[in-house]
Design a protein with these regions (language model features):
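Conserved binding/recognition cores within well-folded domains
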Residues: 118-173
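Two-component/phosphorelay signaling modules centered on CheY-like receiver
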Residues: 2-3, 15-37, 78
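Conserved Asp/Asn-Gly motif in the active-site loop of CheY-like receiver
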Residues: 36-44
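CheY-like receiver
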Residues: 44-129
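Short loop/edge segments at beta-strand edges and connector loops
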Residues: 40, 108, 172-173
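Non-catalytic signal-transmission and effector/linker regions of two-component phosphorelay proteins
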Residues: 1-9
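Conserved sequence signature across two-component system core domains
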Residues: 11-12, 39, 58
Length: 173
């Protein structure tokens, strides 16, 4: 568990709710490397998402501002099928909308700690199950690197340097 890394976005127009959810995520993250970002609106998230699309888990409120969480999730699903989407809202009438975006789960506020921790465990399991990996042969070892961990590649002559979230590996071409 200690080498698991996740990038999680919390999108909620209620700052108190976003902070509460972030606290629960931090509890879940005790044995993991987790980067948490919070956004006050779907628009704020989408503005950032244009530059930073590597989120693993999205915890989304549904009713917020001009763009709702379901519309935002539909836009994200157009180019990211693997991100795990969890709706967290006070409105049960939107449950059916979650199926349109293949949401992992739908939690009703106020969220119970155990519920969210279980859903995050399920999201992590799904991410691992669907994960694509590269087999990299370095000078002294062969390692497996999950594709989602790769940030960029650097090529110089006969060597490729693979820059990951937490690791750098040099591979001969």
């Amino acid at each position: 568990m200690a080498n698991e890394t996740y990038k999680i976005a919390i999108c909620d127009d209620s700052q108190a709710d976003a902070e509460y959810i972030a606290t629960l995520v931090k509890e879940w993250a005790k044995d993991r490397i987790v980067k948490i970002r919070t956004y006050p609106s779907a628009e704020a998230f989408m503005f950032n998402y244009a530059e930073e699309k590597d989120f693993d888990i999205l915890l989304l409120d549904i009713e917020m501002g001009k763009m709702d969480g379901v519309t935002m999730a539909k836009a994200i699903r157009q180019d990211n099928e693997s991100v795990q989407i969890v709706f967290i809202t006070g409105y049960s009438e939107y449950i059916a909308d979650g199926y349109d975006v293949a949401a992992l789960h739908y939690l009703i506020k106020p969220v119970k700690t155990e519920q969210l921790l279980n859903v995050l465990d399920r999201a992590a399991e799904r991410l691992k199950k669907n994960e694509k990996e590269l087999l990299l042969k370095t000078a002294d070892e062969t390692v497996v690197m999950p594709v989602r961990e790769i940030r960029y590649l650097d090529v110089q002559q006969n060597y490729v340097t693979v820059h990951g979230k937490t690791d750098v590996k040099v591979v001969k071409r």
